[in-house]
Amino acid sequence: MQPIRLEFGYSRIGCSAVLSERIKRRAAGKVSDMGDIAISRREFVPGLEASRGVAALMVALFHCGQATYFDATRQTPPLVPGSYRSQSYLDAAFRIAGNGHGAVVFFFVLSGFVLMMMLSRQNDDLKGSAGPFLIGRVLRIYPAVFSTIAIFVGLFLLTGMSLGTPAAYSTSNVIANSLLLRTDINGVMWSLQTEMIAAPLIFSLYWSWRQWGSPSLLLPAFVLIGLSFSKEWSGTPGNGVSLGNLYSFVVGMIACACGKTMVARLPHSASLLVLAIAGFALSRPLLGWWSNWSVILETVFAGLITTFIAYGDPLREGRLMAAARYFGRISYSFYLLHALTLIALWNMPALFGKAVSAGIPPIVLALVAFVSSVLVITPLAHLQHAIVERAGARLGRALTWRLRPKLQADALQRG
């Protein structure tokens, strides 16, 4: 079957959906499925996978820089200071390369982009597509969460080592963490809470966009950006549910919907990609690490990066690209499991302090910790990806295909 494409054009109000002949046939019941938005079902974008791998490594580098050491006054500063200002150029470069918060923002934008395309593949019926989409999200996220929590619990029971307090390992709290109701066993799971909350939002906005076009994406994006300035809405990542980054998913959806037309109208997409990456990298150094405007600007540049990678000139293949794509494939498990190394790295200030006293720069220790942690976690992440994540994906496809015959039969009865 040839992939079905959804073409885009500009209207007076911006980017809007334009039904192709095949989609008109589908709407008339002659075509039962729907292809990707602008990217065919069989066409894969290696650059997006590679960018996801780079983002996962950025988070790991960020966490390694947070390890502390005893200085001459017995204080425990981080190996790499968290502020860009009044620091050495090397520290600033480390923080830019290890911008873990920005990397998570990029994850959210990329999720919005990819899920927009996923929805375009499913049955073109609101009721018919809800089940497969939500089942897919649950089985994409939760199997690896269960596996990771089991590893953390096993390590705690065997050694007593953990990132949190022993109270976090009570039976009720372990269940709550497994369901992503709490995230005090593995703090990085706060972003997965946001992913699950965003799923119904993305689903609703996709169908609103199909009905009303770009205003149904642009208006929620601006509303959510406005809400992000509210402390009650945004919260603190890791301490309760954080909703402040929900607009990042919507920006990813906008990039998916409007990106192809935008890139077609702009020359030199490769140069624009470089500029977008530079803008992403410099947002926090220029506006401040904790500034909400920094996050908003990062989101915009992340949307542009995703757009230029997906719809612009293909990225050059090579060894670095292959390595980045590999980490992109295992990025989810790598992101979850890398926190295991922090149990050790964040609890050895005396050892790091001795190394600093011996003349080793703290930033060098952070880089050594990063390389070591990547070497340790990569095999485990590879196994979890191969065994757990793929099993969840297979189960999701099986359940989806079980639903489809019934959904199609119901559609025939309604027709």
Task: Give the residues covered by each predicted segment.
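Membrane-interface helix-loop-helix regions
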Residues: 75-99, 126-137, 141-196, 200, ...
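Generic alpha-helical transmembrane segments of integral inner-membrane proteins
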Residues: 57, 146, 150-154, 158, ...
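Hydrophobic alpha-helical transmembrane segments
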Residues: 103-113, 194-201
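Alpha-helical transmembrane segments in multi-pass integral membrane proteins
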Residues: 6, 21, 29-47, 61-101, ...
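Residues within membrane-spanning alpha-helices of integral membrane proteins
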Residues: 49, 53-56, 111, 146, ...
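Hydrophobic, membrane-inserted alpha-helices
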Residues: 178, 198-205, 221-229, 274-281
